[in-house]
Regions:
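Alpha-helical transmembrane signal-anchor helices
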Residues: 174-183
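Extracytoplasmic small-molecule ligand-binding "clamshell" domains
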Residues: 1-20, 24, 64, 80-82, ...
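N-terminal globular core domains of eukaryotic regulatory proteins
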Residues: 2, 87-89, 98-104, 124-126, ...
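Ligand-binding cleft/hinge of the Venus flytrap
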Residues: 29-31, 56-58, 67-89
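Sec-exported extracytoplasmic/periplasmic mature domains
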Residues: 6, 10, 62, 75, ...
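Extracytoplasmic/secreted envelope proteins and their assembly/folding machinery
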Residues: 2, 6, 10, 37, ...
């Protein structure tokens, strides 16, 4: 889809993370559409990870989606924490959570807009803003988007948060009890 957007075959895409490389090919809205938070998720019964010690991730297999901001941020966080782990690539969010549920991986790197009953966020690893993006050939459309976003923000400064809360799958985690709660 990104190739189609860059080529002008798609006029508008929401939820695009900004990068210098992308800014050479696309126009981004002046203000963010929202903020995405990134986590390392694991099965709810992983009491060893629920204690909050990143070193518990040492040697584990961690699933990720290729070419997305959360993977870059997550792998950088793991490196900064001194974690040596094995990475396994999966195409698609549902495939990634299925791999976690089926014990193919010990944990996954994912954003906060996707949820699964077989996954609980264990470690907050970072965040980034996301934007509306249009092809460079459509500055007229970007001007309209920026004007609309400004008008909305003037009326309701929390509009973006409300939309995200209403339409994204908020991770309610699992209804499973962890070790201390079971005691």
């Amino acid at each position: 889809l990104m190739d189609m957007l860059e080529a002008g075959q798609i006029d508008l895409m929401p939820n695009i993370s900004y990068s210098e490389e992308r800014a050479q090919k696309l126009l981004f809205s002046s203000n963010p559409e929202g903020t995405e938070r990134y986590y390392i998720y694991a099965r709810p019964d992983r009491d060893d990870l629920a204690k909050g010690d990143p070193q518990a991730l040492q040697g584990l297999t961690i699933g990720y989606n290729p070419g997305v901001m959360q993977t870059f941020v997550g792998q950088q966080w793991l490196t900064n924490e001194g974690i040596a782990c094995t990475y396994r690539e999966y195409d698609g969010d549902s495939v990634l959570f299925d791999a976690l549920a089926n014990n193919e991986v010990d944990a996954v790197i994912m954003n906060d807009t996707i949820s699964s009953p077989s996954a609980s966020p264990m470690f907050y690893i970072g965040s980034s803003d996301y934007y509306f993006a249009v092809p460079k050939s459509r500055p007229d459309l970007m001007n309209d988007i920026n004007a609309a976003m400004t008008a909305i923000a003037r009326v309701n400064p929390r509009y973006n948060d409300e939309v995200k809360s209403h339409y994204s799958t908020q991770n309610s985690g699992s209804s499973s009890l962890n070790g201390p709660e079971r005691s």
